[in-house]
Regions:
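Domain-length cofactor-binding catalytic modules of enzymes
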Residues: 1-190
């Protein structure tokens, strides 16, 4: 900082746990929606049990399709998902704390202040999905990573409701990780 303090930024997530939880619940949502549509198709047959109704029901039952990527969770499945997301967020925070402790212990540094700024998550308290964004409530401390050269911005949230009390997570990348893997070498980076 300008005051000569060292700032350690740990940019790490849940180490695959979040992705695994998301994959599990996408599958649960898909199964739930398929079951719900099959039940609805059977019910329409019983409600309209004449021959034409039977034909319509069979036709609609065969055309019932649920897209995996748009299947939604409801009720207790949604509650379980949100609960598990909170666990993933806590796990990711503990992961960052552990990394920071190991680094500071190794370097003989004393931590005088610490805060966590989470991105790409669902704020379950306010039910706000933040993809590429962070919480920036009034007075809340934020960090916005820029790039490896320029570091990160440390700031304070403005609490703007027009922006869902959010701020951008970062400046974005010039290229994807996969592209960078093939475009650059470690020697070039050094």
């Amino acid at each position: 900082t300008e005051a000569g303090e060292l700032v350690l930024v740990i940019h790490s997530g849940s180490r695959q746990l979040g992705s695994d939880v998301a994959t599990y619940y996408v599958d649960q949502a898909y199964r739930y929606q398929c079951k719900k549509q099959r039940k609805r198709a059977r019910q329409s047959y019983y409600d309209d049990a004449d021959a034409a109704g039977f034909i319509r029901q069979k036709s609609s039952q065969n055309s019932v399709q649920v897209k995996r990527e748009t299947a939604v969770l409801e009720g207790s499945l949604l509650e379980k998902y949100l609960h598990d997301l909170d666990i993933v967020v806590s796990f990711a925070d503990l992961n960052r704390q552990t990394i920071a402790k190991l680094i500071c212990d190794h370097m003989g540094l004393t931590v005088t202040d610490r805060f966590s700024c989470i991105h790409n998550y669902i704020d379950t308290e306010y039910m706000i999905l933040r993809k590429g964004a962070i919480s920036a409530r009034l007075g809340e401390r934020v960090i916005i990573p820029l790039n490896m050269r320029d570091g990160a911005l440390l700031g304070v949230g403005k609490g703007n409701p027009d922006w869902n009390f959010s701020a951008p997570h970062g400046a974005g990348r010039a290229c994807s990780r996969t592209e960078a893997k093939y475009a650059f070498t470690v020697e070039e980076f050094k």
